A protein has these predicted regions:
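Soluble periplasmic/extracytoplasmic beta-strand elements of cell-envelope proteins
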Residues: 66-70, 80, 97, 129-133, ...
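Extracytoplasmic
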Residues: 62-64, 82-84, 90-93, 108-110, ...
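N-terminal Sec-pathway targeting helices
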Residues: 1-13, 19-21
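Beta-lactamase-like hydrolase cores
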Residues: 28-86, 148-156
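Active-site-adjacent, His/Asp/Glu-enriched structural segments that form or flank metal-binding
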Residues: 110-169, 180-184
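Active-site SXXK
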Residues: 75, 89-108, 164, 203-205, ...
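Small-residue-rich helix-loop
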Residues: 54-57, 78-80, 264-431
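A small/polar active-site loop signature that marks catalytic segments
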Residues: 159-160, 170, 182-336
Length: 431
């Protein structure tokens, strides 16, 4: 009898354990099902792909084309055509330069133009040197220089018994790259500090003479600031934000190319800043985006003037997605980009009320190689989703390509309803 009772007791324990195990397993399966991330992602707009396909079927362009759209909100590609082909990006190359500069330097970085003295001021005579130290402020002009020198005059200095030392980041003029066309870089818009030492020496002498200051027992020469033996008397500042905004909004080649200098300085303080800056762009792609740069780009400059520059539509979109996940970068990029039909290089385009103010885009234009027209940026799609897009037209007339892009954006990108305007940064996607 005792054996039967013992057997029944053991059997009950086994059945109870089995029941508990099945319950736990069931709960576990339910738990994993509920935490499946794919179920939490909002659906994409399937009609967007249909609209683009329909538009391309009826309006397929000449030349070569690369297109990609990515729903950042849903974290999913919406559409692509020829997205992995290397194509000439023109000024869309500036997106890579600006994002890299914002990542490694920051929009708030101050750019200094400073005037120092060494030695003592006795009456109206400075017994020592004046040192002008400039960085990469593209807006450094005669007014800036005169304001700095005026502070020397305010100290009561009429005579400099010593040298005027110019400490410049770039002693040679910011010149054309090998594959640019002469005139592409509009030197009349350059800062004085980018026009080389001879020009700076001439302007410095003129600024001193305008204030009635004379150099005795000395000359204007190149040299390096020794901060331990110098006193700061004047400081004019700009920010990296200004360079980024001008590069994007009005597509300034000088500002974009100048951004390579501080990047190159980070890479090697004694090397060629522009060449080293291009190496930093490649390192950014490799280290920050985890992409092999040789598969998605060829970088010959920082502004996109060179026809040897190459990017893929897929890379441009990945760059935009990278930016959207980083608020400090995204704020600068989204606000720096022209707004359709409103400002910048899109001021004269996309005036249809269904498109005006609805899209942000960096434009790119080259008249060489049969024509290059590119457009990449953001718009708000169905259900308030943030969409990143890239369109690259190569080998087709520029004006015709622009008209085609505008129609694509209007008839395919825009849903049937009028979309919300993309004027602010409320659609930041947190990383």
């Amino acid at each position: 009898m005792k054996k039967i009772v013992t057997f029944l007791f053991i059997l009950m324990i086994i059945l109870l354990a089995a029941t508990v195990l099945l319950h736990v397993r069931s709960c576990g399966e339910d738990l994993f099902q509920k935490t499946d991330i794919t179920e939490k992602l909002p659906p994409i707009d399937d009609s967007l792909k249909i609209r683009i396909d329909t538009f391309l079927y009826n309006n397929f362009p000449q030349g070569s084309i690369g297109i990609e759209l990515y729903d950042i909100t849903a974290d999913k590609e919406v559409y692509s055509y020829n997205k992995d082909s290397l194509m000439i990006p023109a000024s869309c190359m500036k997106l890579l330069t600006c994002v890299t500069a914002l990542r490694y330097i920051g929009a708030e970085k101050l750019i200094h133009n400073r005037l120092y003295t060494s030695g003592d001021i006795m009456g109206d005579t400075l017994n020592g040197n004046v040192i002008l130290k400039t960085q990469y402020d593209t807006a450094f002009n005669r007014d800036t220089l005169n304001n700095l020198v005026n502070e020397l005059k305010n100290k009561g200095v009429t005579y400099i018994k010593g040298n005027v030392i110019v400490d410049m980041m770039l002693t040679e003029p910011l010149d054309h790259e090998e594959h640019w066309i002469i005139g592409d870089l509009r030197t009349r818009y350059m800062g004085l500090n980018l026009q080389g030492l001879p020009r700076m020496k001439k302007e410095m002498l003129g600024a001193l003479q305008a204030k009635g200051i004379k150099i005795i027992d000395g000359t204007i020469t190149i040299g390096k600031l020794n901060p331990r033996n110098a006193t700061l008397i004047a400081d004019n500042t700009a920010t990296l934000h200004t360079l980024v905004e001008k590069s994007l909004k009005v597509s300034s080649n000088i500002n974009a190319e100048t951004l390579l200098m501080p990047l190159g300085y980070i890479y090697d303080k004694k090397g060629n800043y522009r060449e080293n800056g291009k190496k930093v762009l490649q390192n950014f792609i490799r280290n920050e985006m985890n992409i092999n740069p040789t598969t998605v780009c060829n970088i010959d400059d920082g502004c996109g003037l060179c026809i040897n520059d190459k990017l893929t539509a897929d890379f441009l979109v990945k760059l935009l997605v990278y930016s959207a996940k980083r608020p400090r970068i995204y704020n600068e990029i989204i606000n720096g980009m022209p707004l359709s039909g409103v400002d910048g290089t899109l001021y004269k385009r996309m005036h249809d009320s269904r498109l005006k103010g609805k899209l942000r885009g960096k434009t790119g234009t080259l008249t060489r190689n049969g024509g290059v027209s590119t457009l990449a940026g953001y718009f708000i799609g169905k259900d308030n989703h943030l969409i990143a897009y890239a369109i690259l037209n190569n080998g087709w007339y520029v004006e015709t390509s622009r008209e085609w892009q505008d129609k694509l954006c209007l008839k395919a990108f825009m849903p049937q309803r009028i979309m919300g305007e993309l004027k602010d940064t409320t659609h930041i996607i947190q990383e």
